Swiss-Prot record:
Subunit and partners: Component of the mitochondrial large ribosomal subunit. Mature mitochondrial ribosomes consist of a small (37S) and a large (54S) subunit. The 37S subunit contains at least 33 different proteins and 1 molecule of RNA (15S). The 54S subunit contains at least 45 different proteins and 1 molecule of RNA (21S).
Family in the record: Belongs to the universal ribosomal protein uL29 family.
Entry protein name: Large ribosomal subunit protein uL29m
Main location: mitochondrion
Domain of life: Eukaryota
Cell location: Mitochondrion
GO biological process, one term: mitochondrial translation
MF (Gene Ontology): structural constituent of ribosome
GO cellular component: mitochondrial large ribosomal subunit
Keywords from the UniProt entry: Mitochondrion, Ribonucleoprotein, Ribosomal protein, Transit peptide
Pfam family, one: MRP-L47
PANTHER family named among the record's database cross-references: LARGE RIBOSOMAL SUBUNIT PROTEIN UL29M, RIBOSOMAL PROTEIN L47, MITOCHONDRIAL-RELATED
Gene behind the chain: mrpl4
Amino acid sequence: MHRQSVARLTRQCHGLPLVELPPPYLAPSLHFSLIRTPVQCSSFSSTAVVAGRGRDLNKTRGVSAIHRTGPRFKLGVSKYPLPKPVSPAALEKREATPNHGLWGFFPRDRSALSTPEYDIAHGRSWSIQELREKSWEDLHCLWWVCVKERNRIATSNLERQRLKAGYGEWEARERDRTIRITQNGIKHVLRERWYAWEDAKRLYKKGYRPQDEENQE
């Protein structure tokens, strides 16, 4: 057995003679580290000491709408009395606005749901050649007429889904497809005008003038 181990065992056994020491083959099991790790005596906690339990300063502690527990003292709603609801018989009748802008999101008969006969009664879409002859103001007005009509179709489709009517989907989809073709044509015409303006600006920067050709003729 190593001398340091024998000396350490002798000190730990309070000076017992060598006869009472364990045999040498048990020395590895009785080997202790020279530096002992400190043993923690208190339980682990991530809370600071100054943040220990004290007086609860939360006045709404325990207030729960689920368990129907209210505050510890009564609270007033307001310093003014609550208004009392008016009975329907005493309400003042208001006249409807016949020309309100929101009526544009409903059919002409102002019903909440458009009928298949109403949705299928429409013409064809505008062709690109017809749209080329329109002015900027006409194209602008036609675009927003298409937008309002598509919003009306979307409103009817939402109401149809809510009521689970089971009819009118095909007619509304065909009407919406026709309107989208017109909108795509308006975009195409505006794109052509934009390219034409870009080409004219490029030619002007290069020095081209239409009146020069007229003078040569």
